Amino acid sequence: MNQGHDMYYQQHMSAGPTQQPPTVTSYNPQPPIMQPSHGSYPAPPQPYGGYPYTNGMPSPQGPPVPGQMGPGSVLPSIAGHHGQAPGPVANQYSGFDTSGQIAPPGMKPRVTATLWEDEGSLCFQVEARGVCVARREDNHMINGTKLLNVAGMTRGRRDGILKSEKMRHVVKIGPMHLKGVWIPFERALDFANKEKITELLYPLFVHNISALLYHPANQNRNNQLMAAAERRKAETGGMRNPQGPPGLPALHHHSMSQNGSQSLSGNIGRPSLDRAHTFPTPPTSASSAVNMGSSDSFTWPPHQAMSNGQQNPMSIDTSLSNTRSMPTTPATTPPGSTLQSMQAYPPASQSYDGSRQLYNAPQLQQSPYQPTSTSPQDRSLYNQATYVKSEMGPPSARPMGSVLPGDHQNDQKPVNGLMHPPQGADQGHNNGVEDEADHEHDPEYTHDSRTYDNSQSQYNYTAPPVSSISSEQAHVSTDMPPGGQHGNSGRSTPRSAAAPQAYYQQAYSTSPRSATHQSTSNLYNVMSNDRGSTTNGSANGDVYSQSTDLSNGYATPVTNGNANLKRGRDDDDDRSSSSGQMDLKRRKTLMDNPISSPVYETMNRPAAAIAHPVSRRR
């Protein structure tokens, strides 16, 4: 355990025979036994050869005398050799001492101090092999984890040793160099001696380690650091114990209290400015930490009364800590304006209520539509959003001359948005009973004029009020001919009826109407004015032609195929001038076809009719 020290004690001593204490003479071949009373080692035996030193000075006969090592030396003295070892020799070879009190040869003390705010203690730090080992000032405990890291010990062995310690303090939070397992001073010295790192850690084990900070080379700096550490320690201790002595203000260089500042002003070692070493720089709002005279305007009235009426520095320190932790806003905003600004919120909430009334206003704008919803003709306008679009025909049992605006497509104009039987049943039902029966299905229109064009609301002409659904025959206009007498249009649109359903597509529904009266879009009606007054036999037909169905440009297919055959023949006649013989061959082929039928003719003719305009556009 201590063989490394044995080689430094030689046989060729310059003075007298070597006499060992009687307790160790019987243990010459073995390492010395550590005395439990002191926790260190006795003088080792000398069985090894000499060790040549470069300076040629003789080796001492034994360890240095305790009087030369200062208080705290626990090595036993050798009889008859008190005072024979000179001072320079003792200082030169004190690195081989296991007490760690004297510096190794040529080694300057390198120690730093830091304030451990979590524990409220000053810590001395010594760096060895890139590891910072700390020692507390209050109880002199040493960070055993960092100590064993200096020895290069593995983590498993280190943790096993530290867990076996009876007295230990585990620190898991805080700065990195302060975390670990803290062990007492004596146990740390034992570990350092076992691992032979005592001289590397000098001056960690020096008892009066704080005196090394006052080196003449850095006297001013060390004075500032120690004074700041002491005041910080007193401040943290006072904050933890509010009943502490009143003579310890937080910052002595501010005249906060008369008794505390006068008692501390007599200290000569105080620096002129040491606030930067005490705590981090406070925010700009904490100007009271720099100038107490100007801080009266930045503190709240309760603290003003406290600082003016009392001379207790601890209460002033409380106000200082509150001022340091305050943001910049309370430094410029008085409490009165803050309360006024908080009272300004209820009017804002009332303005939100007013804005809700603004959003409720469109409901009032929709009030003109409310009276019309009670009439039967408007029930088919506004109650249509829940049904699926269908390709079936219009309602079947309406009279031809009805004045309801939803009836202008009863006769032969199918609407693809209705869920009713096809138009075949339109002409035979004119009595009021079946008309009333069909009225039950009027709300099944799947289109609403509002969803297509909001500008159509100007054409929502309100018909004369209908008293009863079943008595619609009494409200038929007398100036209108029957529905069948309208010219070839095939529609029974009354002259006084509104047409709210504006853009219904006629795309693929079957209709027996002629191609000359195919309905076109409103855009073409406005631009070309083809519909005129001759469509429905009225001079004001253009007003109501806006409500006709929007055509998609396709010809209306008929089940018997007559319209498409007619168009195909017209196209063939037009094309016969350019391709006469091709047309003859094609007709001959079609006539010679033994399986020709109207279905086959219908399927072939639109192909020729569609292909021809493409060739003509070229």
UniProtKB/Swiss-Prot annotation:
DNA-binding interval(s): 144-165
Biased composition (Polar residues): 13-28, 91-101, 256-266, 284-298, 305-326, 336-355, 452-476, 513-563
Subcellular location per the Swiss-Prot or TrEMBL entry: Nucleus
Recorded superkingdom: Eukaryota
Low complexity bias (residue ranges): 48-59, 494-512
Any one annotated GO CC term: nucleus
Ranges that cross the membrane: none
Claim: Transcription is one of the keywords in the record: yes
Predominant location: nucleus
Positions of region (Disordered): 13-105, 229-355, 390-618
Similarity comment: family membership: Belongs to the EFG1/PHD1/stuA family.
Protein name: Cell pattern formation-associated protein STU1
The species this protein was found in: Pyricularia oryzae (strain 70-15 / ATCC MYA-4617 / FGSC 8958) (Rice blast fungus)
Gene: STU1
